[in-house]
């Protein structure tokens, strides 16, 4: 799961990245890499859920909140050093993996889901990055995505899906709804694809390096019956439990959304009409995907090509 599979060709990566417009300008990049001030740091500390299990460093958010008068200046300097360098030290980026059972009758590894317990300092730095990144993504992620962004609720996605199903049933339309559950979606994400996307979207070199260091310098240790295994490194994937992961996953999933929208705009994929000038093509909520298809053989072929391409790029199944 942690090893990188054979990568898609550079041409395939570039072809997919070109579906995105460049949406980060010079002013946006200045804001992304501006100095971290005490007020921003306090806001980040206050945004964390309390009583979380600590990572390998043993520190908790409550520790820094309670002792901010004493430690605040030093903590701010650590975050600022990371920002100015555009890098996070590997020593900050060690992570415990705890296996959480999906049911009371878990008997095999497939019955467990991994949760990452990151170092507290890492969580603080990555949350600073995530808050700044979210301000840009909120206005750019397509309306078909309903996860991780303020103002987008799952009940809205459910309502749209019901409308599509209702149209198929009551208007005697030919069509199909394809439900896709992305297997181990976070674990299979390609780092190469993330780097290409960030570059193409116009993010600055320093900000990209800052993000990629969060992803690529990580080392893992698995907790088994409370005992930690030796640390090892990964070559792909995003951590469930890292503040950055939901937003980076949004970007990865946005590639699939844009590919379907491009096919629609080019007249190669129509989806299902729910009104004279309104059609539904797809909905995404985290790792759950609904695709609405007319059932036409040509459209089915287009959809197959899109899914095969993204299977190569992110190694989704």
Positions of predicted regions on the chain:
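Inter-domain linker/hinge segments that demarcate the starts of reverse transcriptase
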Residues: 30-46, 72-83, 97, 128-133, ...
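Conserved polymerase palm-domain catalytic core
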Residues: 182-286, 294-301
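Short helix-interrupting loop/turn segments at helix-coil junctions
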Residues: 2-12, 51-54, 73, 85-91, ...
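Residues that mediate protein self-association or partner binding, especially
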Residues: 1-5, 45, 53, 68, ...
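Catalytic palm active-site di-aspartate
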Residues: 55, 94-97, 113, 145-147, ...
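Conserved catalytic palm subdomain of right-hand nucleotidyl-transferase polymerases, strongest
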Residues: 52-59, 108-117, 156-199
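Surface-exposed loop/turn segments and immediately adjacent short secondary-structure elements
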Residues: 1-110, 120, 124
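Conserved pre-motif C helix in the palm subdomain of viral-like polymerases
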Residues: 110-141, 159, 235-266, 311
């Amino acid at each position: 799961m942690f090893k990188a599979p054979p990568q898609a060709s550079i041409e395939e990566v570039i072809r997919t990245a070109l579906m995105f417009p460049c949406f980060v300008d010079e002013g946006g990049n200045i804001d992304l890499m501006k100095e971290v001030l005490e007020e921003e740091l306090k806001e980040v500390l206050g945004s964390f859920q309390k009583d979380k299990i600590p990572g390998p460093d043993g520190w908790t958010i409550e520790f820094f909140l309670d002792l901010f008068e004493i430690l605040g200046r030093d903590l701010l300097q650590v975050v600022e050093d990371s920002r100015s360098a555009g890098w996070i030290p590997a020593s900050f980026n060690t992570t415990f993996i705890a296996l959480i059972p999906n049911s009371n009758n878990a008997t095999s590894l497939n019955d467990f889901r991994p949760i990452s317990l990151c170092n507290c300092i890492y969580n603080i730095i990555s949350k600073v990055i995530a808050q700044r990144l979210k301000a840009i993504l909120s206005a750019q992620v397509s309306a078909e995505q309903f996860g991780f962004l303020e103002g987008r609720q799952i009940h809205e996605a459910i309502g749209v899906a019901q409308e599509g199903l209702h149209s198929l049933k009551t208007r005697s339309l030919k069509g199909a709804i394809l439900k896709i559950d992305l297997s181990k979606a976070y674990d299979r994400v390609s780092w190469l694809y993330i780097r290409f996307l960030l570059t193409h979207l116009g993010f600055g070199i320093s900000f990209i390096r800052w993000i990629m260091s969060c992803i690529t310098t990580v080392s893992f240790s698995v907790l088994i019956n409370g005992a930690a295994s030796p640390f090892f490194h990964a070559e792909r994937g995003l951590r469930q439990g890292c503040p950055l992961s939901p937003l980076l996953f949004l970007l990865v999933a946005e590639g699939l959304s844009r590919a379907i929208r491009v096919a629609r705009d080019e007249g190669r994929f129509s989806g299902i009409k729910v009104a004279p000038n309104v059609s539904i093509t797809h909905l995404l909520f985290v790792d759950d995907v609904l695709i609405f298809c007319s059932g036409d053989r040509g459209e089915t072929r287009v959809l197959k090509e899109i899914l095969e391409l993204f299977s190569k790029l992110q190694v989704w199944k």
